[in-house]
């Protein structure tokens, strides 16, 4: 039987997303999520050949138990024998990795070195790699690391450097790395297709908006700047992350309010963003649904700050492109694909650039539907394109390991 399928693993600190894909057609044979690791109610849910299912993994279960369940309970002998390689999503590759690579000892060491920049994600990725080696020994030489930071490695020095003592970059690697690169790469290819141009002639501003969010600007198919920084904390307002703040706020919280560094980190990473602004939830839908409700001013407050910050980044990146033609402003991710309200608020800030929203088109482009959302006489096109990070991981893995 032909080994033409790819098993995709996206290991988080307390969850594991998985899928089995055909890299040529994008046909999804299996997808699912194992979650609540190390808790009493660790569980797994899946969709196999169109049929949904779920199960308990047992109290305290984690990556090992989840992968064992996938291999023994979900993968039939026929499906298992069709898997030719395993693709791992890796959040941070530092400067070492500029593209996807077959995993060996040196790659593992590189992922370990980048733990300092992704302390929650990279250790989980390493567990996933170790468990994949154990459970699928016949595919040990066919594991591929696909890095979220790789797409952004084409940024010029003026974009990735911070105005800190230069030795902090040279000696410690402190610079902008970005994230969501796999999504930004996929959307770049889709904008090129929409524009009828080769990727290496495509210019775009891509807004990946989900619980985490980032904007990137692409010139001739290559990223030249992005909003996330050394870590995914910088940039846009996010679900629970603050995004850009005055760094001196950290000193103030420490010196004046007596907060510990752990408390400050917890505040900026887990208690800010939409959650902090609403004081209710990190879910953007709450802010949308209650935007006009005068009794819930927190909803309007949160969505206005969110969309204003987004518009600032889009406008700045339009300026950076200069004389280069902008093929599209693209929205993707859970919020980018489904929130017509966020798109409307953000694009209305860009009227100076001649951006003109078409209200009906904007409302139609939701729930998996793509399309142009600007008017025919708009100076620039804005489009909605559902992302497909799993397909990019599958295709990169197939190129290197099949």
From Swiss-Prot:
Matching Gene3D superfamilies: 3.30.420.40
EC number: 2.7.2.1
Keyword Endoplasmic reticulum among UniProt keywords: no
EC class: transferase
Cofactor binding: number and manner: Mg(2+). Can also accept Mn(2+).
Site label Transition state stabilizer, positions: 180, 241
Active-site positions on this chain: 148 (proton donor/acceptor)
Domain of life assignment: Bacteria
Residues binding Mg(2+): 10, 389
Reaction catalysed by this enzyme: acetate + ATP = acetyl phosphate + ADP
Principal location listed in the UniProt entry: cytoplasm
Record-listed substrate binding positions: 89
Pathway: Metabolic intermediate biosynthesis; acetyl-CoA biosynthesis; acetyl-CoA from acetate: step 1/2
Binding site for ATP: 17, 208-212, 283-285, 334-338
Pfam families: Acetate_kinase
Role played: Catalyzes the formation of acetyl phosphate from acetate and ATP. Can also catalyze the reverse reaction.
Protein name: Acetate kinase
Organism field: Actinobacillus pleuropneumoniae serotype 3 (strain JL03)
Gene name as annotated: ackA
């Amino acid at each position: 039987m032909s080994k033409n399928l790819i098993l995709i693993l996206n290991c988080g600190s307390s969850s594991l997303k998985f899928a089995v894909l055909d890299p040529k057609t994008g046909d999804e044979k299996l997808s699912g999520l194992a979650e609540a690791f190390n808790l009493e109610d660790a569980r797994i849910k899946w969709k196999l050949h169109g049929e949904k299912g779920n199960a308990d993994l047992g109290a305290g279960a984690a990556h090992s138990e989840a992968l064992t369940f996938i291999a023994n309970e979900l993968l039939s002998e026929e499906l298992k024998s069709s898997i030719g390689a395993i693709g791992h999503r890796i959040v941070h590759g530092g400067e070492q990795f500029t593209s996807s690579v077959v995993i060996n000892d040196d790659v593992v060491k590189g992922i370990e070195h980048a733990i300092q920049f992704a302390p929650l994600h990279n250790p989980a990725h390493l567990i996933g790699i170790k468990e994949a080696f154990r459970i699928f020994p016949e595919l040990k030489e066919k594991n591929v690391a696909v890095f979220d930071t790789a797409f952004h490695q084409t940024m010029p020095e003026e974009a990735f450097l911070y105005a800190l003592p230069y030795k902090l970059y040279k000696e410690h690697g402190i610079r902008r790395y970005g994230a969501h690169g796999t999504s930004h790469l996929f959307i770049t290819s889709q904008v090129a297709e929409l524009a009828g141009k080769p990727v290496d002639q495509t210019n775009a501003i891509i807004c990946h908006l989900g619980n985490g969010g980032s904007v990137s600007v692409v010139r001739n198919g290559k990223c030249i700047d992005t909003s996330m920084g050394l870590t995914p904390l910088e940039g846009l307002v996010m679900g629970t992350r603050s995004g850009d703040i005055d760094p001196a706020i950290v000193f103030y919280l420490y010196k004046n309010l007596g907060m510990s560094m752990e408390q400050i980190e917890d505040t900026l990473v887990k208690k800010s963003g939409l959650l902090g602004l609403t004081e209710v939830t990190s879910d953007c839908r709450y802010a949308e649904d209650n935007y006009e409700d005068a009794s819930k001013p927190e909803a309007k407050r949160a969505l206005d700050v969110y969309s204003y910050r987004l518009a600032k980044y889009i406008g700045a990146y339009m300026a950076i492109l200069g004389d280069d033609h902008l093929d599209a402003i693209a929205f993707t991710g859970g919020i980018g694909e489904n929130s017509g309200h966020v798109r409307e608020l953000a694009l209305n800030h860009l009227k100076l650039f001649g951006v003109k929203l078409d209200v009906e088109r904007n409302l139609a482009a939701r729930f998996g539907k793509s399309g142009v959302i600007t008017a025919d006489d708009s100076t620039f096109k804005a489009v909605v394109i559902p992302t497909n990070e799993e397909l990019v991981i599958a295709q990169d893995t197939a190129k290197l390991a099949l």
